[in-house]
Design a protein with these regions (language model features):
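Walker B catalytic motif
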Residues: 155-163
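Conserved GNAT acetyl-CoA-binding A-motif
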Residues: 336-352
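ABC ATPase nucleotide-binding domain signature region
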Residues: 8, 37-106
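GG-anchored amphipathic helix commonly corresponding to the ABC/SMC/Rad50 NBD signature/C-loop
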Residues: 67-69, 122-143, 147-155
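Conserved ABC ATPase signature
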Residues: 113-124
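Pre-NBD coupling/linker segments of ABC/ABC-like ATPases
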Residues: 1-45, 92, 217, 240-242
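A conserved beta-strand-loop-helix scaffold within acyl/acetyltransferase catalytic domains
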Residues: 259-321
Length: 403
């Protein structure tokens, strides 16, 4: 365990306005501001993956984080105004950059090619998170080469402070899923005043900063002595960190899936990685999370001379809900419904995150592995009745749902 006992001192220049405020509110004013912060934290040699320092503003969270993890504390960084975010993520290979962006819940290729300045606060938060993780990750080792004790540490202060609580919960779940699933080989400490993300981030330990003279000592004389010292110096603040080991279960994610009209498509159109169009014959479905539309899926009849069936036409998850599997759950629910008609259900995609999921999932069978699609001749189009492939020139993969 790492024991920290921090005495914070700050000299104060006297002024007429300070005296005015002190007189108005009967405040004691000295020439020095003092704070005493104490805490015990797990050491870096211990086998934990995610930690959290939480408490109200001014309770010493940042002071403890700086004292314990100064070298690993992420500092605000500059984003060029005219450079796409994929070009501002460092020198790593593109597959690592897109993989990390997808892991933190920013899985839209259309967003990847935008500059940071035009993104929403939620998207900016995930970009900052992805770049911090990428900068910490080793460049020459694969995930399996690093035991937990040797993985780099990333510490972020004011975690989720600038985003809505819904985005904070979803982003925390996405990050926890990526770290626990060994997709991102780092350890992570969040410093925040928001306790609502604890069950979503699922930390191994939580340090709660509490104001006042609470002591870990059992000796009453020691407690009385400390209390007297605080009363005698009202300009001094005292805070104690209480450590709890835990890994709470993530709250259950309840989705409501409904057949919807195509009128809902404009909400999702600009977030589709390929096209904003929707076929007139598309049958549309949406997943709702906490009564908010989160994901959209559309299917079409799939004409084939031997195995006619259905195919996935569009699959979109809104940026605020990416990273926790809502899109894939909607896709598989819709696929299962169509397979129950006795006809096969196919899906073709070029999105790296979806391809990665379906390759690993027992619910999908690879029909065509990732690669370029050959052009279809006019004779073949006439024989099969199929339109010319729109995925020519792109790396795609085709799957059949077998779940």
């Amino acid at each position: 365990m790492l024991k920290l006992d921090c005495h914070l001192l700050c000299t104060l220049r006297d002024s007429f306005r300070i005296r005015q405020v002190a007189g108005m509110f009967d405040l004691p004013v000295g020439d020095t501001s003092r704070a005493h912060v104490r805490a015990q934290l797990p050491g870096l040699h211990e086998p934990w993956e995610i930690g959290m320092i939480v408490g109200p503003s001014g309770s010493g969270k940042s002071a403890i984080a700086r004292a314990a993890y100064r070298a690993n504390l992420v500092q605000p960084s500059h984003w060029p105004r005219d450079v796409a975010i994929v070009d501002a993520m460092g020198d790593g290979p593109i597959h690592r950059i897109t993989h990390t962006l997808t892991c933190v819940g920013l899985g839209s290729p259309r967003t990847w090619v935008k500059p940071y300045a035009v993104l929403s606060n939620g998207e900016k938060f995930r970009c900052d998170l992805a770049r911090a993780l990428l900068n910490a990750m080793p460049k020459d080792q694969v995930h399996e080469d690093l035991p937990i004790e040797n993985q780099p540490l990333v510490v972020i202060d004011e975690y989720t402070s600038v985003v809505s609580r819904a985005i904070a919960r979803v982003a925390s779940a996405a990050l926890s899923r990526a770290i626990r699933g060994k997709q991102i080989p780092v350890r992570f400490v969040a410093v925040t005043c928001h306790e609502d993300v604890i069950p979503w981030l699922r930390p191994d330990w939580v340090l709660r900063m509490q104001p006042g003279g609470a002591e870990e000592q059992s000796d009453p004389k020691s407690q009385i002595s400390n209390l007297k010292s605080e009363i005698s110096d009202p300009s001094s603040d005292s805070f104690l960190g209480v450590l709890t080991w835990c890994r709470p279960e993530r709250p259950k994610i309840d989705l409501d899936i409904h057949r919807v009209s195509r009128d809902l498509w404009p909400l999702f159109r600009r977030h589709h990685y390929l096209s904003g169009s929707l076929h007139p014959a598309a049958q549309c479905f949406a997943a709702y999370f906490e009564n908010e539309p989160a994901a959209f899926c559309a299917a079409l009849p799939f004409p084939h001379p031997r195995r006619p069936g259905w195919r996935e036409h569009r699959l979109v998850c809104l940026p605020d809900f990416q990273g926790i599997g809502i899109g894939t759950k909607l896709s598989e629910t819709v696929a299962r419904m169509y397979v129950s008609t006795g006809r096969p259900y196919f899906g073709t995609t070029s999105h790296p995150g979806i391809i990665r999921h379906r390759v690993r999932s027992p619910l999908w069978r690879i029909v065509r592995p990732p690669g370029m699609v050959s052009p279809v001749s006019r004779a073949e189009m006439k024989r099969t009745g199929m339109a010319r492939f729109c995925s020519i020139g792109r790396i795609t993969a085709s799957f059949e749902f077998i779940g």
